Curated annotation (Swiss-Prot):
Its EC number is 7.1.1.-. NDH is composed of at least 16 different subunits, 5 of which are encoded in the nucleus. It is found in: Plastid, Chloroplast thylakoid membrane. Keywords: Chloroplast, Membrane, NAD, NADP, Plastid, Plastoquinone, Quinone, Thylakoid, Translocase, Transmembrane, Transmembrane helix. PROSITE patterns: COMPLEX1_ND1_1 (PS00667), COMPLEX1_ND1_2 (PS00668). Its main location: plastid. This is NAD(P)H-quinone oxidoreductase subunit 1, chloroplastic. The chain crosses the membrane at residues 27-47, 94-114, 128-148, 164-184, 202-222, 247-267, 303-323, 335-355. InterPro entries: NADH_UbQ_OxRdtase_su1/FPO, NADH_UbQ_OxRdtase_su1_CS. GO terms for molecular function: oxidoreductase activity, acting on NAD(P)H, quinone or similar compound as acceptor; quinone binding. The keyword Plastid applies. GO terms for biological process: aerobic respiration; photosynthesis, light reaction. The gene is ndhA.
Length: 362
Protein backbone atom coordinates (compact mmCIF):
# COMPACT_ATOMS: atom_id res chain seq x y z
CA UNK A 1 0.00 0.00 0.00
CA UNK A 2 1.35 3.40 -1.03
CA UNK A 3 0.87 6.23 1.49
CA UNK A 4 0.46 9.66 -0.02
CA UNK A 5 3.04 12.22 1.10
CA UNK A 6 0.31 14.81 1.68
CA UNK A 7 -1.46 12.42 4.06
CA UNK A 8 1.76 11.89 6.03
CA UNK A 9 2.30 15.65 6.36
CA UNK A 10 -1.32 16.08 7.44
CA UNK A 11 -0.93 13.41 10.12
CA UNK A 12 2.33 14.97 11.35
CA UNK A 13 0.84 18.46 11.52
CA UNK A 14 -2.20 17.11 13.37
CA UNK A 15 -0.01 15.34 15.95
CA UNK A 16 2.09 18.48 16.39
CA UNK A 17 -1.00 20.63 16.94
CA UNK A 18 -2.29 18.17 19.54
CA UNK A 19 1.09 18.24 21.28
CA UNK A 20 1.08 22.05 21.28
CA UNK A 21 -2.41 22.07 22.79
CA UNK A 22 -1.23 19.79 25.60
CA UNK A 23 1.82 21.99 26.21
CA UNK A 24 -0.32 25.16 26.28
CA UNK A 25 -2.68 23.43 28.69
CA UNK A 26 0.22 22.62 31.03
CA UNK A 27 1.59 26.17 30.75
CA UNK A 28 -1.85 27.55 31.68
CA UNK A 29 -1.95 25.34 34.78
CA UNK A 30 1.56 26.32 35.96
CA UNK A 31 0.57 29.73 37.49
CA UNK A 32 -2.30 28.06 39.37
CA UNK A 33 0.01 25.36 40.73
CA UNK A 34 2.57 28.01 41.71
CA UNK A 35 -0.14 30.00 43.50
CA UNK A 36 -1.41 26.90 45.35
CA UNK A 37 2.15 26.08 46.43
CA UNK A 38 2.64 29.66 47.62
CA UNK A 39 -0.66 29.59 49.53
CA UNK A 40 0.33 26.33 51.24
CA UNK A 41 3.68 27.76 52.31
CA UNK A 42 2.04 30.97 53.52
CA UNK A 43 -0.49 29.04 55.64
CA UNK A 44 2.33 27.05 57.25
CA UNK A 45 4.22 30.28 57.98
CA UNK A 46 1.09 31.94 59.44
CA UNK A 47 0.41 28.98 61.73
CA UNK A 48 4.01 29.04 62.95
CA UNK A 49 3.98 32.83 63.44
CA UNK A 50 0.72 32.72 65.37
CA UNK A 51 2.06 30.07 67.73
CA UNK A 52 5.33 31.91 68.27
CA UNK A 53 3.67 35.32 68.79
CA UNK A 54 1.04 33.79 71.08
CA UNK A 55 3.76 32.09 73.11
CA UNK A 56 5.66 35.37 73.38
CA UNK A 57 2.54 37.25 74.54
CA UNK A 58 1.79 34.57 77.14
CA UNK A 59 5.47 34.39 78.19
CA UNK A 60 5.87 30.70 77.44
CA UNK A 61 7.84 28.51 75.04
CA UNK A 62 6.19 27.85 71.69
CA UNK A 63 6.60 24.80 69.43
CA UNK A 64 10.23 23.71 69.26
CA UNK A 65 10.46 19.95 68.63
CA UNK A 66 9.04 19.48 65.10
CA UNK A 67 11.84 20.81 62.92
CA UNK A 68 14.14 23.77 63.61
CA UNK A 69 12.37 26.34 65.79
CA UNK A 70 9.15 24.32 65.44
CA UNK A 71 8.74 25.25 61.76
CA UNK A 72 7.37 21.81 60.87
CA UNK A 73 4.77 21.68 63.66
CA UNK A 74 1.90 22.56 61.29
CA UNK A 75 2.97 19.78 58.90
CA UNK A 76 3.04 17.34 61.83
CA UNK A 77 -0.46 18.41 62.88
CA UNK A 78 -1.77 18.07 59.33
CA UNK A 79 -0.25 14.61 58.96
CA UNK A 80 -1.87 13.51 62.21
CA UNK A 81 -5.28 14.74 61.03
CA UNK A 82 -4.86 12.88 57.73
CA UNK A 83 -4.25 9.63 59.62
CA UNK A 84 -7.24 10.09 61.93
CA UNK A 85 -10.48 8.20 61.31
CA UNK A 86 -13.21 10.12 59.49
CA UNK A 87 -16.20 9.57 61.79
CA UNK A 88 -19.68 10.27 60.40
CA UNK A 89 -22.67 11.11 62.63
CA UNK A 90 -25.12 8.18 62.64
CA UNK A 91 -28.24 10.38 62.44
CA UNK A 92 -26.83 13.24 60.42
CA UNK A 93 -27.27 14.26 56.79
CA UNK A 94 -24.14 12.58 55.42
CA UNK A 95 -24.05 14.24 51.92
CA UNK A 96 -24.39 17.75 53.39
CA UNK A 97 -21.99 16.81 56.19
CA UNK A 98 -19.32 15.90 53.61
CA UNK A 99 -19.95 18.83 51.24
CA UNK A 100 -19.88 21.58 53.89
CA UNK A 101 -16.07 21.75 54.44
CA UNK A 102 -15.41 21.57 50.68
CA UNK A 103 -17.68 24.55 49.95
CA UNK A 104 -15.93 26.62 52.61
CA UNK A 105 -12.43 25.79 51.30
CA UNK A 106 -13.23 26.29 47.59
CA UNK A 107 -14.93 29.64 48.16
CA UNK A 108 -11.89 30.98 50.00
CA UNK A 109 -9.41 29.62 47.43
CA UNK A 110 -11.34 31.28 44.58
CA UNK A 111 -10.77 34.65 46.26
CA UNK A 112 -7.07 34.42 45.34
CA UNK A 113 -7.98 34.72 41.64
CA UNK A 114 -8.31 38.51 41.83
CA UNK A 115 -5.57 39.32 44.38
CA UNK A 116 -2.56 41.04 42.73
CA UNK A 117 0.38 39.74 44.74
CA UNK A 118 2.89 41.71 42.70
CA UNK A 119 3.42 43.73 39.55
CA UNK A 120 1.82 41.77 36.66
CA UNK A 121 1.25 38.83 38.99
CA UNK A 122 -2.50 38.21 39.19
CA UNK A 123 -4.44 35.25 37.82
CA UNK A 124 -7.50 37.25 36.70
CA UNK A 125 -7.44 41.04 36.33
CA UNK A 126 -11.21 41.53 36.16
CA UNK A 127 -13.06 44.84 35.96
CA UNK A 128 -15.30 43.65 38.83
CA UNK A 129 -12.51 42.08 40.88
CA UNK A 130 -13.41 43.39 44.35
CA UNK A 131 -17.11 42.63 43.91
CA UNK A 132 -16.32 39.13 42.70
CA UNK A 133 -14.37 38.63 45.94
CA UNK A 134 -17.34 39.83 48.01
CA UNK A 135 -19.70 37.53 46.10
CA UNK A 136 -17.40 34.52 46.49
CA UNK A 137 -16.73 35.16 50.18
CA UNK A 138 -20.50 35.16 50.79
CA UNK A 139 -20.62 31.48 49.81
CA UNK A 140 -18.42 30.25 52.69
CA UNK A 141 -21.08 30.74 55.43
CA UNK A 142 -23.39 28.45 53.43
CA UNK A 143 -20.87 25.64 53.91
CA UNK A 144 -20.64 26.40 57.63
CA UNK A 145 -24.44 26.42 57.97
CA UNK A 146 -24.66 23.12 56.08
CA UNK A 147 -22.02 21.65 58.40
CA UNK A 148 -23.92 22.74 61.49
CA UNK A 149 -27.33 21.59 60.23
CA UNK A 150 -26.18 18.20 58.90
CA UNK A 151 -24.38 17.23 62.12
CA UNK A 152 -27.69 16.65 63.98
CA UNK A 153 -26.15 18.27 67.04
CA UNK A 154 -27.57 21.26 68.89
CA UNK A 155 -24.13 22.78 69.49
CA UNK A 156 -23.19 22.42 65.82
CA UNK A 157 -26.49 23.87 64.64
CA UNK A 158 -26.17 26.85 66.98
CA UNK A 159 -22.64 27.44 65.70
CA UNK A 160 -23.82 27.30 62.08
CA UNK A 161 -26.61 29.81 62.76
CA UNK A 162 -24.16 32.11 64.51
CA UNK A 163 -21.74 31.90 61.58
CA UNK A 164 -24.49 32.83 59.10
CA UNK A 165 -25.79 35.71 61.25
CA UNK A 166 -22.28 37.05 61.84
CA UNK A 167 -21.36 36.89 58.16
CA UNK A 168 -24.52 38.74 57.07
CA UNK A 169 -24.05 41.39 59.77
CA UNK A 170 -20.50 42.31 58.76
CA UNK A 171 -20.67 41.66 55.01
CA UNK A 172 -22.71 44.83 54.43
CA UNK A 173 -20.30 47.31 56.14
CA UNK A 174 -17.44 45.55 54.35
CA UNK A 175 -19.18 46.04 51.01
CA UNK A 176 -19.80 49.74 51.68
CA UNK A 177 -16.09 50.23 52.45
CA UNK A 178 -15.12 48.49 49.20
CA UNK A 179 -17.62 50.66 47.29
CA UNK A 180 -15.99 53.80 48.70
CA UNK A 181 -12.54 52.60 47.57
CA UNK A 182 -13.93 51.75 44.14
CA UNK A 183 -15.35 55.28 43.81
CA UNK A 184 -12.03 56.86 44.80
CA UNK A 185 -10.10 54.73 42.30
CA UNK A 186 -12.71 55.01 39.50
CA UNK A 187 -12.43 51.26 39.05
CA UNK A 188 -13.43 47.95 40.64
CA UNK A 189 -10.32 46.14 39.40
CA UNK A 190 -7.87 45.24 42.15
CA UNK A 191 -4.92 46.06 39.88
CA UNK A 192 -6.34 49.52 39.05
CA UNK A 193 -6.95 50.20 42.75
CA UNK A 194 -3.30 49.47 43.55
CA UNK A 195 -2.04 51.57 40.64
CA UNK A 196 -4.27 54.48 41.73
CA UNK A 197 -2.29 54.60 44.99
CA UNK A 198 1.14 54.58 43.34
CA UNK A 199 1.59 58.25 42.36
CA UNK A 200 2.38 59.73 45.78
CA UNK A 201 3.90 56.64 47.38
CA UNK A 202 3.22 56.34 51.10
CA UNK A 203 1.07 59.49 51.09
CA UNK A 204 -1.12 58.17 48.28
CA UNK A 205 -2.39 55.16 50.19
CA UNK A 206 -6.15 54.94 50.64
CA UNK A 207 -5.46 54.58 54.36
CA UNK A 208 -5.11 58.38 54.58
CA UNK A 209 -8.05 59.17 52.30
CA UNK A 210 -10.34 56.62 53.96
CA UNK A 211 -9.31 56.35 57.65
CA UNK A 212 -12.87 55.64 58.83
CA UNK A 213 -13.38 53.08 56.08
CA UNK A 214 -10.07 51.45 56.99
CA UNK A 215 -11.09 50.96 60.63
CA UNK A 216 -14.52 49.60 59.64
CA UNK A 217 -12.92 47.29 57.08
CA UNK A 218 -10.39 46.08 59.66
CA UNK A 219 -13.07 45.23 62.24
CA UNK A 220 -15.36 43.64 59.64
CA UNK A 221 -12.50 41.53 58.28
CA UNK A 222 -11.71 40.19 61.75
CA UNK A 223 -15.40 39.35 62.19
CA UNK A 224 -15.52 37.61 58.80
CA UNK A 225 -12.47 35.55 59.80
CA UNK A 226 -14.21 34.61 63.09
CA UNK A 227 -11.17 35.63 65.09
CA UNK A 228 -11.28 36.66 68.72
CA UNK A 229 -13.15 38.67 69.95
CA UNK A 230 -15.55 37.57 67.17
CA UNK A 231 -15.23 33.77 67.40
CA UNK A 232 -18.83 33.24 68.57
CA UNK A 233 -19.60 30.46 66.01
CA UNK A 234 -17.03 28.17 67.67
CA UNK A 235 -16.92 29.45 71.24
CA UNK A 236 -15.39 26.55 73.19
CA UNK A 237 -16.95 27.42 76.55
CA UNK A 238 -20.48 27.59 75.09
CA UNK A 239 -20.64 25.35 72.00
CA UNK A 240 -17.75 22.86 72.46
CA UNK A 241 -16.42 23.64 68.95
CA UNK A 242 -19.51 25.04 67.21
CA UNK A 243 -20.18 23.72 63.72
CA UNK A 244 -16.93 21.68 63.93
CA UNK A 245 -18.05 19.61 66.93
CA UNK A 246 -18.92 16.41 65.01
CA UNK A 247 -16.01 16.60 62.58
CA UNK A 248 -12.77 14.64 62.76
CA UNK A 249 -9.80 13.78 60.58
CA UNK A 250 -9.30 15.52 57.26
CA UNK A 251 -12.68 17.31 57.34
CA UNK A 252 -11.82 18.92 60.66
CA UNK A 253 -8.47 19.87 59.15
CA UNK A 254 -10.26 21.60 56.25
CA UNK A 255 -12.10 23.89 58.68
CA UNK A 256 -8.78 24.55 60.39
CA UNK A 257 -7.34 25.44 56.98
CA UNK A 258 -10.29 27.72 56.11
CA UNK A 259 -9.73 29.89 59.18
CA UNK A 260 -6.12 30.62 58.20
CA UNK A 261 -6.93 31.04 54.50
CA UNK A 262 -9.59 33.59 55.46
CA UNK A 263 -7.04 35.44 57.56
CA UNK A 264 -4.54 35.45 54.67
CA UNK A 265 -7.14 36.68 52.15
CA UNK A 266 -8.28 39.47 54.49
CA UNK A 267 -4.68 40.54 55.10
CA UNK A 268 -3.96 40.71 51.37
CA UNK A 269 -7.12 42.70 50.64
CA UNK A 270 -6.29 45.18 53.41
CA UNK A 271 -2.91 45.59 51.70
CA UNK A 272 -4.39 45.95 48.20
CA UNK A 273 -7.24 48.31 49.11
CA UNK A 274 -5.60 50.54 51.74
CA UNK A 275 -1.81 50.05 51.89
CA UNK A 276 -0.78 50.47 48.27
CA UNK A 277 -0.29 46.81 47.37
CA UNK A 278 3.09 46.10 45.78
CA UNK A 279 4.11 49.77 45.42
CA UNK A 280 7.15 51.34 47.03
CA UNK A 281 6.50 53.85 49.80
CA UNK A 282 8.71 56.58 48.30
CA UNK A 283 6.75 58.96 46.01
CA UNK A 284 7.83 59.52 42.39
CA UNK A 285 10.70 57.03 42.73
CA UNK A 286 10.84 53.66 41.03
CA UNK A 287 13.97 51.63 41.64
CA UNK A 288 13.58 49.80 38.33
CA UNK A 289 13.20 53.03 36.37
CA UNK A 290 17.01 53.38 36.43
CA UNK A 291 17.47 50.16 34.46
CA UNK A 292 16.59 49.18 30.93
CA UNK A 293 13.48 46.99 31.16
CA UNK A 294 14.04 43.36 30.16
CA UNK A 295 12.81 39.95 31.27
CA UNK A 296 15.24 39.66 34.19
CA UNK A 297 14.38 43.11 35.54
CA UNK A 298 10.68 42.36 35.05
CA UNK A 299 10.92 39.13 37.04
CA UNK A 300 12.96 40.87 39.75
CA UNK A 301 10.35 43.65 39.96
CA UNK A 302 7.59 41.07 40.32
CA UNK A 303 9.47 39.20 43.08
CA UNK A 304 10.17 42.40 45.03
CA UNK A 305 6.54 43.44 44.58
CA UNK A 306 5.38 40.12 46.07
CA UNK A 307 7.79 40.63 48.98
CA UNK A 308 6.42 44.15 49.64
CA UNK A 309 2.81 42.92 49.47
CA UNK A 310 3.43 40.08 51.91
CA UNK A 311 5.36 42.36 54.28
CA UNK A 312 2.38 44.72 54.48
CA UNK A 313 -0.02 41.78 54.87
CA UNK A 314 1.97 40.46 57.84
CA UNK A 315 1.29 43.75 59.61
CA UNK A 316 -2.44 42.94 59.61
CA UNK A 317 -1.64 39.37 60.68
CA UNK A 318 0.36 40.64 63.64
CA UNK A 319 -2.49 42.97 64.66
CA UNK A 320 -5.08 40.18 64.45
CA UNK A 321 -2.93 37.77 66.47
CA UNK A 322 -2.26 40.43 69.11
CA UNK A 323 -5.98 41.28 69.35
CA UNK A 324 -6.76 37.59 69.85
CA UNK A 325 -4.84 37.50 73.13
CA UNK A 326 -5.78 41.03 74.23
CA UNK A 327 -9.56 41.44 73.98
CA UNK A 328 -12.19 39.18 75.59
CA UNK A 329 -14.90 37.46 73.58
CA UNK A 330 -18.08 39.46 72.93
CA UNK A 331 -21.61 38.26 73.59
CA UNK A 332 -23.78 37.46 70.59
CA UNK A 333 -26.05 40.46 71.15
CA UNK A 334 -23.02 42.76 71.46
CA UNK A 335 -21.59 41.38 68.21
CA UNK A 336 -24.83 41.95 66.28
CA UNK A 337 -25.31 45.41 67.79
CA UNK A 338 -21.77 46.38 66.77
CA UNK A 339 -22.44 45.31 63.20
CA UNK A 340 -25.95 46.66 62.65
CA UNK A 341 -26.11 49.70 64.96
CA UNK A 342 -22.53 50.97 64.79
CA UNK A 343 -20.49 49.81 61.79
CA UNK A 344 -23.34 49.83 59.26
CA UNK A 345 -24.33 53.52 59.81
CA UNK A 346 -20.68 54.61 59.91
CA UNK A 347 -19.80 52.75 56.69
CA UNK A 348 -22.92 54.10 54.96
CA UNK A 349 -22.08 57.67 56.04
CA UNK A 350 -18.50 57.19 54.83
CA UNK A 351 -19.80 56.00 51.45
CA UNK A 352 -22.12 59.01 51.14
CA UNK A 353 -19.28 61.42 52.01
CA UNK A 354 -17.01 59.76 49.45
CA UNK A 355 -19.72 59.95 46.79
CA UNK A 356 -20.36 63.63 47.56
CA UNK A 357 -16.65 64.51 47.37
CA UNK A 358 -16.32 62.70 44.05
CA UNK A 359 -19.32 64.56 42.63
CA UNK A 360 -17.95 67.92 43.79
CA UNK A 361 -14.55 67.21 42.21
CA UNK A 362 -16.09 66.52 38.78
Amino acid sequence: MIIDRVEVETINSFSKSELLKEIYGLIWILPILALLLGITIEVLVIVWLEREISASIQQRIGPEYAGPLGLLQAIADGTKLLLKEDILPSRGEIPLFSIGPSIAVISVLLSFLVIPLGYRFVLADLSIGVFLWIAISSIAPIGLLMAGYSSNNKYSFSGGLRAAAQSISYEIPLTFCVLAISLLSNSSSTVDIVEAQSKYGFFGWNLWRQPIGFLVFLISSLAECERLPFDLPEAEEELVAGYQTEYSGIKYGLFYLVSYLNLLVSSLFVTVLYLGGWNFSIPYISFFGFFQMNKIIGILEMVIGIFITLTKAYLFLFISITIRWTLPRMRMDQLLNLGWKFLLPISLGNLLLTTSSQLVSL
